[in-house]
C-alpha cells in the first residue's frame, strides 16, 4: 500500500496539495461546470471529481430537507464556479464519496466554504467508512465566514482571487479513512436559517 493522502484542497496552492514527497491527490472537485439553471429539490448530484488519481466512482452531492431548495453555481474562491444552495435546515449537508483503496495515512480532507449574511455559519464534518450506514464526527464544529463582510478583511468570492486563509477548512488525522472501499464525508449544517440564506463550497 502506498503512503499517499486524500488531499482535497485549494487547487491553486501547490503546497496545499502535496503534504509530503509521497503525497497524492486522490480526488478533487474544482467546480469546472455550472449547475443547470433553476435546479430545485431536496437532493442534487454535482458529479464525479475532475482532479486526482482515483476519480472513478466518486461523487459530490447535497441533501436538504426542504423541497424548494435551489442549487446554483455562483463564483468560487478563485474559480469560475462553486456549489451553492439555500433553504438550510439543521442536518442538511454537502457530501463527497470516494474510495481510498491503495492509500494509507496521512489522510486529509480540505475544502473552501462561505455563506451569505443570512446563510448558516455553524457546521460539523462527519465521516463514514461503511457506505453511509454509520457516521462519526471528525470535526465537531467550525464557523463559516461571510465573504466580504465588513471588518473580515475579505472580499466576496470571485473567479480571480483565492483566499485560502479565511475560507479553507482542513481536517487531518483521518486514519480510519485509509484503505477503504467506501469513504463518505458530510459537511453538515447544525443550524436552521432564513430560506434565502445561502452557503457554498469550492475546491474540495
Regions found by a protein language model. Give the residues of each.
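Extended, low-complexity, turn-rich repeat/linker tracts enriched in Gly/Pro/Ser/Thr and Asp/Glu
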Residues: 102-105, 114-122, 194
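Short, threonine-centered small-residue motifs that mark membrane-proximal processing/anchoring sites
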Residues: 2-25, 204
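Surface-exposed, low-complexity/disordered Ser/Thr/Gly/Pro/Asn-rich loops and linkers
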Residues: 53-105
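Short glycine-centered, acidic/aromatic-flanked micro-motifs in structured strand/loop junctions
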Residues: 98, 113, 187-189
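Conserved Ser/Thr-centered positions that define the repeating blades of beta-propeller domains
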Residues: 126-129
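Extracellular carbohydrate-recognition regions
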Residues: 23-57
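Structural beta-strand segments of beta-rich domains
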Residues: 107-109
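Terminal, low-complexity interaction segments
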Residues: 26-36, 117-118, 135-204
Amino acid at each position: 500500500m502506498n503512503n499517499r493522502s486524500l488531499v482535497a484542497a485549494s487547487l491553486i496552492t501547490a503546497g496545499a496539495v502535496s503534504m509530503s514527497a509521497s503525497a497524492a491527490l486522490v480526488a478533487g472537485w474544482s467546480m469546472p461546470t455550472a449547475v443547470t439553471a433553476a435546479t430545485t429539490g431536496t437532493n442534487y448530484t454535482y458529479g464525479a471529481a475532475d482532479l486526482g488519481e482515483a476519480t472513478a466512482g466518486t461523487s459530490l452531492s447535497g441533501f436538504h430537507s426542504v423541497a424548494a431548495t435551489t442549487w446554483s453555481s455562483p463564483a468560487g474562491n478563485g474559480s469560475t464556479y462553486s456549489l451553492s444552495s439555500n433553504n438550510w435546515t439543521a442536518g442538511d449537508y454537502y457530501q463527497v464519496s470516494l474510495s481510498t483503496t491503495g492509500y494509507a495515512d496521512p489522510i486529509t480532507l480540505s475544502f473552501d466554504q462561505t455563506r451569505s449574511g443570512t446563510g448558516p455559519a455553524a457546521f460539523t464534518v462527519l465521516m463514514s467508512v461503511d457506505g453511509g450506514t454509520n457516521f462519526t464526527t471528525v470535526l465537531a464544529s467550525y464557523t463559516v465566514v461571510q465573504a466580504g463582510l465588513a471588518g473580515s478583511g475579505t472580499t466576496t468570492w470571485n473567479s480571480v482571487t483565492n483566499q485560502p486563509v479565511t475560507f479553507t477548512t482542513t481536517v487531518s488525522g483521518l486514519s480510519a479513512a485509509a484503505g477503504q472501499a467506501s469513504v463518505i464525508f458530510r459537511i453538515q449544517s447544525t443550524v436552521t436559517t432564513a430560506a434565502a440564506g445561502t452557503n457554498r463550497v469550492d475546491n474540495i
